[in-house]
């Protein structure tokens, strides 16, 4: 009887594993295929893309889009500017999020509820990401034992020292989550630069790519009356569009695997437990 139960249990477990594996495989395909499609479309003839001939493999391979993108002298400066803005913005933003989240996790903080309401109001006018603050606060409240804070207080440790010596070393997962969230936000931000920056030499990469795409579209419109000119210009515009997506996405795709372990752990600890 017991052996039959074990056989049934093993059979049900195998069935679950097969179904679960199939579901995860489908999910991976749904997430990864759009990225793959953009990559192969960026090196394929646009007419082949429109005809649906690049479903799995590139067709009539061409690198004209990448040549046009990297031909611009502003690309290198755009990359450096984006890296500078992303690193500086991430460091400042994550530092503010961590300190604010740590303070808000203290139930003894005077006017704690009123301050939280104030922060929620600021969601509508920018500043520190309140969502990130809430996730960080939840992490500090639920993932680090309060006894550690109490022991540090008994030993004479102040709030700042407790935060630096105890809370931060144990907060690597949530730090990774905040770094990824903030880096992606700063890396993809072009509208802020469009509003405030006058010098093109200071444009971030996303704005540089936008300018290149707009110029190529304008060129296609100007060549509309020329025989075959519009078709060729429009073809180049499509290549530039796909190439720009790849060029702008590669740095974040490279960075993510290095923090994936901390990202998953921190996101679950900071969100689900709360």
What is the meaning of each model-derived region?
Residues 2-274:
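A hydrophobic, multi-pass inner-membrane permease signature
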């Amino acid at each position: 009887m017991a052996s039959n139960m074990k056989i049934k249990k093993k059979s049900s477990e195998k069935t679950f594993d097969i179904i679960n594996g199939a579901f995860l495989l489908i999910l991976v395909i749904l997430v990864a295929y759009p990225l793959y499609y953009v990559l192969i479309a960026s090196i394929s003839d646009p007419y082949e893309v429109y005809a649906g001939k690049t479903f799995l493999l590139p067709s009539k391979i061409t690198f004209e889009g990448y040549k046009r993108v990297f031909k611009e002298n502003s690309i290198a400066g755009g990359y450096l500017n984006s890296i500078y803005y992303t690193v500086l913005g991430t460091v400042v933003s994550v530092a503010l999020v961590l300190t604010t989240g740590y303070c808000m996790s203290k139930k003894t903080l005077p006017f704690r509820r009123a301050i939280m309401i104030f922060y929620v109001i600021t969601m509508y006018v920018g500043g520190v990401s309140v969502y990130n603050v809430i996730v960080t606060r939840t992490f500090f409240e639920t993932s680090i034992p309060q006894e550690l804070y109490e022991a540090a207080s008994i030993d004479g440790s102040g709030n700042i020292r407790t935060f630096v010596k105890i809370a931060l070393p144990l907060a690597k997962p949530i730090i990774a989550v905040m770094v990824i969230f903030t880096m992606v936000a700063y890396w993809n931000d072009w509208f802020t630069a469009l509003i405030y920056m006058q010098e093109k030499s200071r444009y971030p990469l996303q704005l540089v790519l936008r300018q290149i795409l707009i110029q190529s579209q304008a060129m296609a419109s100007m060549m509309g009356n020329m025989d075959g000119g519009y078709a060729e210009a429009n073809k180049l515009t499509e290549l530039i569009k796909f190439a720009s997506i790849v060029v702008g996405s590669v740095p974040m795709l490279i960075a993510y695997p290095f923090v994936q372990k901390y990202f998953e752990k921190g996101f679950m600890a900071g969100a689900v437990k709360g």
